[in-house]
């Protein structure tokens, strides 16, 4: 005897055509950007191959992030050659339990090295978030980089996915 798995569509609840925007219903992308202190930076190596490394990060604004990078690091050499990059940030605490159930976002943008004589605001922002970095921020081979956000791909949990532009992020009123 075989069981029938057909459903009566007349008894199924009706669903709205479109889920409300994650951005308009919460300030989650900005919260993640403002509270994340560590991220995975994706760059392209000399051969054009993807290269991912762990970096520390601080938000100057939701669309301008600051990184402190060593000139000895491969990701720094990659950014100097090709500034387009991505940065994965995970909502603090989201790495516990099932990390795929937590919120995270991938930032796409461009990173530029800041001049040492004009990086005071970036320096203050970064060192406020990473006090221990003061021990090496003055080393000659370290420089601050500003990552300018072009767009964000937000995964706010299972099935809650949205790609937003930098202008949408800054115009959100939540």
Question: What positions do the PLM features span?
Answer:
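Short, structured beta-strand-loop surface elements
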Residues: 74-129, 139, 149
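An N-terminal domain-cap segment
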Residues: 3-7, 12-80, 88
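Short, surface-exposed beta-edge/turn micro-motifs
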Residues: 36-38, 63-65, 82-85, 139-144, ...
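Conserved hydrophobic/aromatic beta-strand scaffold that supports enzyme active sites
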Residues: 52-56, 106-108, 144-146, 152
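A generic structural motif
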Residues: 58-61, 115, 153
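C-terminal edge-of-domain segments
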Residues: 2-24, 129-174
């Amino acid at each position: 005897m075989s069981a029938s798995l057909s459903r009566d569509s007349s008894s199924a609840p009706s669903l709205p055509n479109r889920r409300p925007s994650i951005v308009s219903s919460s300030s989650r992308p900005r919260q993640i950007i403002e509270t994340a202190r560590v991220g995975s930076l994706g760059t392209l190596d000399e051969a054009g191959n993807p290269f991912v490394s762990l970096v520390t990060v601080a938000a100057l604004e939701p669309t301008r992030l600051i990184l402190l990078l060593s000139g000895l690091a491969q990701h720094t050499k990659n950014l100097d050659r090709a500034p387009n990059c991505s940065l994965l940030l995970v909502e603090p605490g989201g790495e516990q339990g099932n990390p795929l159930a937590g919120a995270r976002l991938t930032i796409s943008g461009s990173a530029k090295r800041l001049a040492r004589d004009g990086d005071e605001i970036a320096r203050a922002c970064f060192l406020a978030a990473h006090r221990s970095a003061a021990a090496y921020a003055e080393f000659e081979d370290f420089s601050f980089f500003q990552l300018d956000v072009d767009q964000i791909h937000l995964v706010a949990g299972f099935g809650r996915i949205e790609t937003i532009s930098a202008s949408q992020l800054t115009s959100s009123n939540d």
